[in-house]
Amino acid sequence: MAEGSFSVQSESYSVEDMDEGSDEVGEEEMVEGNDYEEFGAFGGYGTLTSFDIHILRAFGSLGPGLRILSNEPWELENPVLAQTLVEALQLDPETLANETAARAANVARAAASNRAARAAAAAARTAFSQVVASHRVATPQVSGEDTQPTTYAAEAQGPTPEPPLASPQTSQMLVTSKMAAPEAPATSAQSQTGSPAQEAATEGPSSACAFSQAPCAREVDANRPSTAFLGQNDVFDFTQPAGVSGMAFPRPKRPAPAQEAATEGPSAASGVPQTGPGREVAATRPKTTKSGKALAKTRWVEPQNVVAAAAAKAKMATSIPEPEGAAAATAQHSAEPWARMGGKRTKKSKHLDDEYESSEEERETPAVPPTWRASQPSLTVRAQLAPRPPMAPRSQIPSRHVLCLPPRNVTLLQERANKLVKYLMIKDYKKIPIKRADMLKDVIREYDEHFPEIIERATYTLEKKFGIHLKEIDKEEHLYILVCTRDSSARLLGKTKDTPRLSLLLVILGVIFMNGNRASEAVLWEALRKMGLRPGVRHPFLGDLRKLITDDFVKQKYLEYKKIPNSNPPEYEFLWGLRARHETSKMRVLRFIAQNQNRDPREWKAHFLEAVDDAFKTMDVDMAEEHARAQMRAQMNIGDEALIGRWSWDDIQVELLTWDEDGDFGDAWARIPFAFWARYHQYILNSNRANRRATWRAGVSSGTNGGASTSVLDGPSTSSTIRTRNAARAGASFFSWIQHR
């Protein structure tokens, strides 16, 4: 389950259980209280009844198509709409089959890659064993307590002078001892120490003098940390991505002392001053045990360098002596993993493009922490005689994302876009603007780098399938709202429970517009008092008027409530909010006023010209946005594949989105349906804007051609105009106080 989600525990409830009457819910539990009274208004959701909880539990047994109801907390805000949207955006059988086949292919490809990697690891281990067997140096067995040969060498302390160059025979023995390290048994808890002669024969001729000067070598080895090589899958399974979905693979153990001695070279032990007893060495050795808290902070472990290992294998097979410095560098690069500790992790994202498989080192260079070996006194190694093996091209280096990154799949993006559509429609139910940060946190999540394409696909689905447009009303705070773009609710006729609030909001917007686009609080309340609305008296349909106007409408961005500067005592004023500017227009508010007074809108000449200019500016902005959106969709190849499903807008209306007097459900995205009045844009987009402006100006100034102008203004009789007329009938005397201008 994704981060940030939770599940509702199912208790084996089903629809049949509800039909049979098990765990019956009394009628009074469903109808009493205010659970549904404010369900479709400006926010103010009531608490869910036991019947709603019963339904949610029953949804858990209806199959995987409805499991999202218990996975996403934001969908529980409106479970009925969530269920309908799940059915609406469900993929057809053919698309589901293709998606299932694609996912099965991805799983099969990942399994094949794992098998190939393990086979390569087994072949490499077999080759290593053969090389070791062919180059093993026969060492005499020493009788006594310690009879098992070993390749351990005492660790030297202090600086070492630069020794003469080693012979090829010495380097060949170094390779042999280095290859013998992987063959050591993994079950040994402590390293066993042989005789000095035996160790000298193993390490080379230049290391014998070190053992004659190092007493208590048994204690030194006993104080060394016991190590064991990882299993077959852990060492060579480099294709497994580290740190995927918060999972970290076991960290490779510290290399054995024999491997360390081989890395330091055959001459590392010669010429070293006499070491102290083993206990003193152990006391001076830094503490290497990491606490559990530090281990828990380890985010991922860098996979071993396969290219360097292949180069080392080739050199061992051909018995080519490798310089000591190169061997040390190779061993340090391949045997010691780079562990990035915890802290502020880099951005987690899923890359859907095959061409872009960048690792996290490209975003942030990880700091290599000091290891237990680096904290010991440094040893002087001789200069490298040959350069390090060249790195292979990037395409040959396996990426950590090779298994966790599927190829770019439009179905995955569209699936997340459909989820965003449901999220937007449910969140817009309260008519509070939706933040981009909430979209990223609740829906987009790991696909944050593909946010532009996902939100564009969601916008396309909203427009083509539901007749709704996603508008970004605030470019700085990134706030989004849903507005109607066509006659998408023509069947929603008659009065609704939002009619009183719709009427009040239109009155307030009209007062602000007729008073110079701003109205002080005193002027507004004076106008409302003439209608019988007072701030201290609770209205039976509107509730607390002061809270509704100064809090609810402000949160929904219909109004702005600001303090008048340099006012003493402080006074406040109201302005149009961002949502009101996008959901309605000055021309529509002016027509609303004219209809209530049975007058022509052109009688308010100054306000009419201002409304016309505002309409043209809005049209220009819409055309520019539409052009930019068309170019973006062409680049992203967004088309009819976004309209997957069997559901149409009419199905939505018939099934759920009709609101009657009893109050069952409502229009989720047009609680106050400010569809652009009469959609006059549909009439004027087909003509030239310059000629159109001249025609409008001529009709307004001379009064001629008034019939044509009136027809353009009136437009078709849409549901938005019908709702406006119903609101006008509910308050016929709203604007009786407006003076003729």
UniProtKB/Swiss-Prot annotation:
One of its GO terms (biological process) is negative regulation of transcription by RNA polymerase II. Residues 14-27, 354-363 have a biased composition (Acidic residues). The keyword Cell cycle does not apply. Interacts with TRIM27. Expressed only in brain and ovary among normal tissues. Isoform 1 and isoform 2 are specifically expressed in glioma cells among cancer cells. Detected in some renal cell carcinoma samples. Residues 1-27, 136-206, 247-296, 323-379, 700-720 are annotated as: Disordered. The lineage of its organism: Eukaryota, Metazoa, Chordata, Craniata, Vertebrata. Keywords: Tumor antigen, Ubl conjugation pathway. GO terms for cellular component: nucleus. InterPro entries: MAGE, MAGE_WH1, MAGE_WH2, MHD_dom. PROSITE patterns: MAGE. Residues 1-13, 140-151, 187-196, 701-720 have a biased composition (Polar residues). It holds the Pfam family MAGE. May enhance ubiquitin ligase activity of RING-type zinc finger-containing E3 ubiquitin-protein ligases. Proposed to act through recruitment and/or stabilization of the Ubl-conjugating enzyme (E2) at the E3:substrate complex. This is Melanoma-associated antigen D4. Residues 413-611 form the MAGE domain. The keyword Lipid metabolism does not apply.
